[in-house]
């Protein structure tokens, strides 16, 4: 929840990619900071007054951190008054909410645990922090976290939540409890489903007067009982007996960081009845409640799950030519880690898509990992006031250019090499962009199949290639000669749809070249335009020259 807790992470800037300041003159720094400040204030007002949210919790948190970092770069630009919720809450907490220190990794957790005893782990439930006050066995107050000292009076709404205990007995009859109101889920797997904007949804239900029936979706996870029993097991037993079942079910003793890591992975990948964004490790013995204050909870720490996405700044826009001759746009990003991958660029796609997304240098992109760990753009979450977008080069290449190497063809030529060595074409083991660049620099190739004629000695002479690797590489190139004919024409770039491939496996070059447009249209997935492209491809002089050269190399089918 946007509850003022993000400031606890500001001490981590030194280890973050966010520590790099924008290369802006002071006037622009003031302008950009003012705009982002105003937007965050507007989002916060909507969130706290209406329970609405135009952006996800993750994006809000990361842009808030970005604003704080910019302020460090350009001090004195705007008043720093948006780090706490709007000052509408006037209900004072009997015991302050401390917040929780966030640890970056397993090493940090191990260091924090050192010399501590009576440690317990809980999932870091993602919802709305709340104080519940019981007097003489009755729920007399429910207070939103607010700034940790004061919050919104939510008592009337809390009494409408069916899952919330309204009556307590014994030691809980006069107690102060702190916990998380959460949206009850059925088998939520965090790794797959992510955060689902759970915080905003809970806040919305608590702040809308017309949502009484929907409050049945809410439950509570009690994570603190200030001045309660000192023994954690007894504490959880009493909470469970009173109807607060989740904290007892999901609180476990730990003594080693390996156990913490195991629970973290287990809860990240397993079905849970709530959304969570990490784990909390806490000491069983806590200071007296009167000593609690915001930002001073030294007896507990959080280790969050790896983020599903990151907000990253665009550092530059580059254009490259793909194997089809189409201009591709790549955004160079501030380097950040996403899952276990260091991400520093993302493929935007065509010039048309780049223009539609309106991405400029300095903009903030939400980046996640698609299949096989490939970065992708989820959204443009913030655009700078001053737009900086390079002019794309004129298009002068197409699907039939750059089979032969020339200085102006270097990008498309390299793209063709990368394609032909991929699993979708000739599947040359261990060969990719870096190796093709090295080979081309040492032994300039005339055309895209010239590597077939390289000797072992030539490959071994390439910088970075050892004698053993050169021998292995030559062997890989030699094995490729036995690939089926259809793989070779795919490597050349034959524009045939997947559905028609099976009917071409028994063909050879001469049979393909002899086909008319009508014969091509008879194949699955081939229409009039594609048939025309296929005939043009097979009769293009450069393609014909490559086919003749492959025939001289005794490649099957040529």
UniProtKB/Swiss-Prot annotation:
SMART domains: LIGANc (SM00532). It is an enzyme of class 6 (ligase). The keyword Ligase applies. The active site is at residue 124. Keywords: DNA damage, DNA repair, DNA replication, Ligase, NAD. Gene3D superfamilies: 5' to 3' exonuclease, C-terminal subdomain, DNA ligase/mRNA capping enzyme, Helix hairpin bin, Nucleic acid-binding proteins. GO terms for molecular function: DNA ligase (NAD+) activity. It catalyses: NAD(+) + (deoxyribonucleotide)n-3'-hydroxyl + 5'-phospho-(deoxyribonucleotide)m = (deoxyribonucleotide)n+m + AMP + beta-nicotinamide D-nucleotide. It comes from the Bacteria. Disulfide bonds: none annotated. SUPFAM superfamilies: DNA ligase/mRNA capping enzyme, catalytic domain (SSF56091), Nucleic acid-binding proteins (SSF50249), RuvA domain 2-like (SSF47781). The keyword Nucleotide-binding does not apply. Its EC number is 6.5.1.2. One of its GO terms (biological process) is DNA replication. PANTHER family: DNA LIGASE (PTHR47810), DNA LIGASE B (PTHR47810:SF1). Belongs to the NAD-dependent DNA ligase family. LigB subfamily. Catalyzes the formation of phosphodiester linkages between 5'-phosphoryl and 3'-hydroxyl groups in double-stranded DNA using NAD as a coenzyme and as the energy source for the reaction. This is DNA ligase B. The gene is ligB.
């Amino acid at each position: 929840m946007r509850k003022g807790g993000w400031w606890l992470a500001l001490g981590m800037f030194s280890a973050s990619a966010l520590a790099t300041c924008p290369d802006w003159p002071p006037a622009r720094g003031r302008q950009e900071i003012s705009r982002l400040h105003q937007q965050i204030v507007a989002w916060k007002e909507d969130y706290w007054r209406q329970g609405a949210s135009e952006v996800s919790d993750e994006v809000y948190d990361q842009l808030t951190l970005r604003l704080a970092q910019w302020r460090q770069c350009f001090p004195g630009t705007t008043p720093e008054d948006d780090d706490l919720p709007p000052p509408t809450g006037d209900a004072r907490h009997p015991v302050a909410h401390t917040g929780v220190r966030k640890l970056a990794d397993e090493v940090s957790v191990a260091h924090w645990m050192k010399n501590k005893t009576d440690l317990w782990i809980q999932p870091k439930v993602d919802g709305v922090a709340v104080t519940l006050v019981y007097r003489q066995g009755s729920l007399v107050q429910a207070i939103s976290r607010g700034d940790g000292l004061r919050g919104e009076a939510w008592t009337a709404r809390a009494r409408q939540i069916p899952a919330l205990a309204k009556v307590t007995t014994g030691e809980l009859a006069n107690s102060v409890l702190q916990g998380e109101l959460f949206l009850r889920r059925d088998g939520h797997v965090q790794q797959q489903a992510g955060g689902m904007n759970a915080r905003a949804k809970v806040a919305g239900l608590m702040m809308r007067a017309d949502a009484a029936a929907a409050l049945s979706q809410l439950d509570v996870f009690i994570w603190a009982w200030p001045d309660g029993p000192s023994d954690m097991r007894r504490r959880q037993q009493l909470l469970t007996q009173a109807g607060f079942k989740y904290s007892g079910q999901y609180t476990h003793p730990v003594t080693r960081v390996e156990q913490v890591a195991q629970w973290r992975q287990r809860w990240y990948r397993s079905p849970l009845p709530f959304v969570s964004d990490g784990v909390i490790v806490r000491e069983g013995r806590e200071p007296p409640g009167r000593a609690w204050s915001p930002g001073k909870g030294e007896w507990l720490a959080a280790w969050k799950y790896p983020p599903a996405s990151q907000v990253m700044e665009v550092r530059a826009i580059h254009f490259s030519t793909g194997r089809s001759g189409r201009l591709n746009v790549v955004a160079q990003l501030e380097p950040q880690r996403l899952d276990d991958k260091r991400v520093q660029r993302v493929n935007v796609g065509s010039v048309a898509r780049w223009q539609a997304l309106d991405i400029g240098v300095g903009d903030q992109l939400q980046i996640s990992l698609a299949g096989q760990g490939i970065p992708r753009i989820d959204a443009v979450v913030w655009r700078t006031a001053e737009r900086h977008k390079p002019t794309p080069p004129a298009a002068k290449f197409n699907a039939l250019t750059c089979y032969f190497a020339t200085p102006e063809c270097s990008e498309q030529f390299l793209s063709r090499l990368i394609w032909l060595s991929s699993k979708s074409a000739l599947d040359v083991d261990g060969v990719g962009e870096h190796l093709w660049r090295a080979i081309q620099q040492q032994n300039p190739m005339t055309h895209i199949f010239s590597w077939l004629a390289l000797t072992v000695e030539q490959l071994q002479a390439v910088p970075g290639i050892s004698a053993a690797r050169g021998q292995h590489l030559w062997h890989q190139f030699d094995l490729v000669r036995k690939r089926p004919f259809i793989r070779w024409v795919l490597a050349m770039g034959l524009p045939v749809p997947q559905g028609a491939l099976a009917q071409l496996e028994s063909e050879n070059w001469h049979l393909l070249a002899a086909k008319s447009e009508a014969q091509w249209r008879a194949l699955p997935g081939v229409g009039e335009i594609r048939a025309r492209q296929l005939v043009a491809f097979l009769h293009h002089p450069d393609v014909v020259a490559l086919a003749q050269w492959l025939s001289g190399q005794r490649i099957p089918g040529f």
